[in-house]
Amino acid sequence: MFVKLLRSVAIGLIVGAILLVAMPSLRSLNPLSTPQFDSTDETPASYNLAVRRAAPAVVNVYNRGLNTNSHNQLEIRTLGSGVIMDQRGYIITNKHVINDADQIIVALQDGRVFEALLVGSDSLTDLAVLKINATGGLPTIPINARRVPHIGDVVLAIGNPYNLGQTITQGIISATGRIGLNPTGRQNFLQTDASINHGNSGGALVNSLGELMGINTLSFDKSNDGETPEGIGFAIPFQLATKIMDKLIRDGRVIRGYIGIGGREIAPLHAQGGGIDQLQGIVVNEVSPDGPAANAGIQVNDLIISVDNKPAISALETMDQVAEIRPGSVIPVVVMRDDKQLTLQVTIQEYPATN
């Protein structure tokens, strides 16, 4: 019995020695040990580079007005943010930030303060362009004209909420192409869950590279049931903002073409009467009296097939197309009415002025 026990112990020792030689990792195995690492070697996830690229170009904007109850002293009425677009000193902000201002003050992040000149503003997009005359260089926002914002892109909202000083909030692009959020229904917004608070209006919405994606413009204050929703903010896409800026710099206002209809797009359908051609277009549901469309003979329930030789697929895109046509131009508009195709000549007018 004792001999068998010794034999078993000896075999166990031999097997153990073989395993230690074959698998050296077993020698230091300690099930109670905690993995050690040096945190100084790790790089934390950060958007600091994007902030350093974009933030210097985002300014504080102060709307000052005369207070007749205080011996006509200038006082701050509203505050917001703005974005320096180029070295000439042009700044984009929201129109509602500078409405009725007697004086506009712009404060840069480097401590410089300027009185700004209002170049022009546009009610339909709620955009305004300011200009400052600065000696020395100005920080400008990075713009990549080829960059297309996508749902899920990380974005940073930069502005001056509640006059706390420059603040950065982070989120994603929640949706693109949001329309119908302003009275004109013509606006095309980016939606984001990055916080956009009072004072952020006119500030920059940038991507993770610090490139301008949009101009922060508004957030939902109340929902239909009276609750204050969180994570719903909007920005004007940078492509539209830069286009409006160029027009304001050139003309001092935005000159838009106007056709004078309201409508909705329809999906392709087969023409009545067994025709094989598929129709797609905009059904006219409103014609402004004495407007260009009415004067050309366009009627309610007409189906617009093309405008100025371009297919009419989206009501918003077609209105944007018309807006780019200079007033006074005569364009062909093809409509279907009672199974007949008509080509009508429409003289474009200037879009009626709004406050």
Curated annotation (Swiss-Prot):
Positions in coiled-coil regions: none
Effect of a null allele: Small, slowly growing colonies. 5-fold decrease in basal sigma-E (RpoE) activity, loss of regular growth regulation of sigma-E. No proteolysis of full-length RseA.
Activity regulation (UniProt): Allosterically activated by the C-terminus of exposed OMP peptides (consensus Tyr-X-Phe-COOH); cleavage only occurs in the presence of peptides. Inhibited when RseB is bound to RseA.
Membrane protein topology class: Single-pass membrane protein
InterPro entries per record: PDZ, PDZ_sf, Pept_S1C_DegS, Peptidase_S1_PA, Peptidase_S1_PA_chymotrypsin, Peptidase_S1C
Annotated substrate binding sites: T184, I259, G260, I261, G262, G263, R264, Y351
Any one GO MF annotation of this record: serine-type endopeptidase activity
Catalytic activity field: Acts on substrates that are at least partially unfolded. The cleavage site P1 residue is normally between a pair of hydrophobic residues, such as Val-|-Val
Similarity annotation: Belongs to the peptidase S1C family.
Classification via PANTHER family: PERIPLASMIC PH-DEPENDENT SERINE ENDOPROTEASE DEGQ, SERINE PROTEASE FAMILY S1C HTRA-RELATED
Protein name per Swiss-Prot or TrEMBL: Serine endoprotease DegS
Gene name tied to this protein: degS
